Regions:
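Signature of N-terminal electron-transfer/Fe-S-associated modules in redox systems
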Residues: 1-108
Length: 108
């Protein structure tokens, strides 16, 4: 498939590096069976934007230099996209709660 967005991090569904969007929800792919998502639309980082025209959240990460090694960034971006699609005017508390499951190995 040549998809490089989802990463294999912990393999336990704890770090968020493997995040994809399934049915509008941020979903940890490392603990999700293929059978449970068969026939579902699945969005990876590659499905959001392009190098020439990044998704607004991708652009915000670029503008704010919100990355170091980049390993965790796809999961963080997909988590943010799923949250803001569901709750466009999310409160700070909702954002913190949603992003809490994404661990950055460089900074934590």
């Amino acid at each position: 498939l040549d998809l490089r967005g989802p990463k294999f991090g912990c393999g336990l569904g704890q770090c968020g590096a493997c995040m994809v969007i399934v049915k509008g929800q941020a979903t940890r792919s490392c603990v999700t069976t293929v059978a449970s998502v068969a026939g579902s639309e699945i969005t990876t980082l590659e499905g959001l934007g392009t190098v020439e025209k990044p998704h607004p959240i991708q652009q915000a990460f670029i503008d704010e230099q919100a990355m170091q090694c980049g390993f965790c960034v796809p999961g963080q971006i997909l988590t943010a996209v799923a949250l803001l699609r569901k709750t466009p005017k999310a409160s700070r508390e909702q954002i913190v709660e949603a992003m809490n499951g994404n661990i950055c190995r460089c900074c934590n």
